[in-house]
């Protein structure tokens, strides 16, 4: 069973999103700490440089949305995929999952757990374990497996 990605991460450092952000009046850079330099992931900054947002699309961060602000938009990416007899699952996950679990790994985990609830829990647990190995920080982790059979 092979994973098929139905979306891409809306992160400021992807070339596609960075160009769109810069065209919308924002710019992309990590946070800067005095005496330390740049830290953390790339962020979207508006002209005031008061806040940096680590995602390039958002429906709730309205301070970033609007003309000549930051280039952050609330417009979703919509894709389609024609199902065939080999498709078994749709797996949704937050960036806390996808930062540490590949799409193919998620498919393999789901295949080992026929119950969608158990598969969802196993994918989330895998992500949590990998976050813990990388230090004390952990992002939000949510996984949902929908069975198509």
Predicted regions and their residues:
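PP2C/PPM-type serine/threonine phosphatase catalytic core
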Residues: 1-149
């Amino acid at each position: 069973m092979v994973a098929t990605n139905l979306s891409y991460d809306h992160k400021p450092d992807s070339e596609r999103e960075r160009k769109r952000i810069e065209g919308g009046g924002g710019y992309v850079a990590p946070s800067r700490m005095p005496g330390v330099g740049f830290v953390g992931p790339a962020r979207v900054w508006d002209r005031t440089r008061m806040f940096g947002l680590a995602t390039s699309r958002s429906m709730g961060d309205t301070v970033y949305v609007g003309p000549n602000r930051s280039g952050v938009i609330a417009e979703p990416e919509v894709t389609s995929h024609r199902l065939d007899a080999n498709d078994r699952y749709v797996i949704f996950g937050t960036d806390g999952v996808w930062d540490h679990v590949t799409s193919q790994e998620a498919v393999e985990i789901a295949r080992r757990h026929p119950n969608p609830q158990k598969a969802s829990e196993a994918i989330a647990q895998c992500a949590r374990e990998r976050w813990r190995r990388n230090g004390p920080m952990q992002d939000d982790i949510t996984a949902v497996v929908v069975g198509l059979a």
